[in-house]
């Protein structure tokens, strides 16, 4: 439990999430708008596609988790995927923004499905081992909290940078001009992403000792089945991700049709990510040390709920107050997103404590499965609300559409953050219990190692 990690290792690990988000954040920020306003895919078709493919991605996570748990190489279980899986991922991150505008609508939809599914599968085969790697680097709670904070900051900075780089380029641009912008930036980001993944690979090591051999699929599933804290955390994560992606998918529509100024898109993303997540993530290790991971999550969820409720009421009549409300909500959301990674890592030890079986890959994949479902639901809710309210691309919108956009960006996230608070209120794995579990696991390993040594001698 004493594996203290250097800042070089922590920063190197976080660069992997920068690379992750070159593919991931582009989709969250721009893909729905690209499909509807540039590629000419209908809002309802785009929303359905985003929902179905992200559900496919969720199942791809489970497949990837099992693949990861079955691998053991001279580089470890997880690091090889960062080395060999990145090129296909980055290629698909370019292809999803390459819908040819002169195709028929049906051809565009088929191409969107195929390329987005390919992106999701490749992302799972890189992101699952990347996330699982944290559980193998250390069992020390503060170091795990720092890893979570570092990747949270890295992801948020990536969101902000992409918004500042690409947002102004598409401001007041025609659909034809936007095509060139998306093509240029996706290629640049793909090359940079491969470099950053390699740095992450070289900067990290797997330090947690494993004694038990790779378990069968049946034993692995039985281990998951008994892990009640993992299932509760997954449901809480589902709610937080629905909230997060409802905001991300609605932001461009909010600034374009409610505020009537796409130039404010970068400001909105800046407040949501830099002021929110980057401001909150450094606070999390200290909060964890003082009040524990569970209470840290609860404070974040409550702050997010109140912030989004205020944002809804002021989202039209006062932009400065609306930005303050969004900042409050984003700080709360940032706290929950950051501490979530440390909570997930703890559930690996809980499963090992109950059954003697350590399955980082499958545990993380189930956690990621529910996160992907949250992304799917949260990302598609705005599309469905737009369709139901009568949205027509690139036109002056009706009051019903404006209310739909406000609901998507504020009320939907408010409700799901409140639900996350209620669920984690009953979360059973406290920091005190976790420390007892790690001590027990270490004692078991010492006994097993001694038995192996005695038999060998």
UniProtKB/Swiss-Prot annotation:
Q: Which Pfam families match?
A: MFS_2 (PF13347)
- CDD domains of this UniProt entry? MFS_MelB_like
Question: InterPro entries this protein is in?
Answer: MFS_2, MFS_trans_sf, Na/Gal_symport, Na/Gal_symport_CS
Q: Does the keyword Transmembrane helix apply?
A: yes
Give TM regions.
12-34, 38-60, 80-100, 109-129, 147-167, 181-201, 229-249, 264-284, 297-316, 321-343, 373-393, 409-429
Q: What are the cysteine partners in each disulfide bond?
A: none
Q: Which GO terms describe its biological process?
A: carbohydrate transport; sodium ion transport; transmembrane transport
Subcellular localization(s) per the UniProt record: Cell inner membrane
Q: Name one GO cellular component term.
A: plasma membrane
**Keyword terms of this UniProt record:** Cell inner membrane, Cell membrane, Membrane, Transmembrane, Transmembrane helix
The record's GO molecular-function terms, alphabetically, read: symporter activity
**PROSITE patterns recorded for this chain?**
NA_GALACTOSIDE_SYMP (PS00872)
- What highest taxon heads this organism's lineage? Bacteria
Which residue ranges does the entry give as Cytoplasmic-facing topology? 1-11, 61-79, 130-146, 202-228, 285-296, 344-372, 430-457
Q: How does it sit in the membrane?
A: Multi-pass membrane protein
Q: Which residues lie on this side of the membrane: Periplasmic?
A: 35-37, 101-108, 168-180, 250-263, 317-320, 394-408
The record's listing under SUPFAM superfamilies reads:
MFS general substrate transporter
PANTHER family noted in UniProt: 2,3-DIHYDROXYPROPANE-1-SULFONATE EXPORTER-RELATED, MAJOR FACILITATOR SUPERFAMILY DOMAIN-CONTAINING PROTEIN
Family membership, please give it.
Belongs to the sodium:galactoside symporter (TC 2.A.2) family.
Q: What is the protein name stated in its UniProt record?
A: Glucuronide carrier protein homolog
Name its species.
Escherichia coli (strain K12)
Q: What is the lineage of its organism?
A: Bacteria, Pseudomonadati, Pseudomonadota, Gammaproteobacteria, Enterobacterales
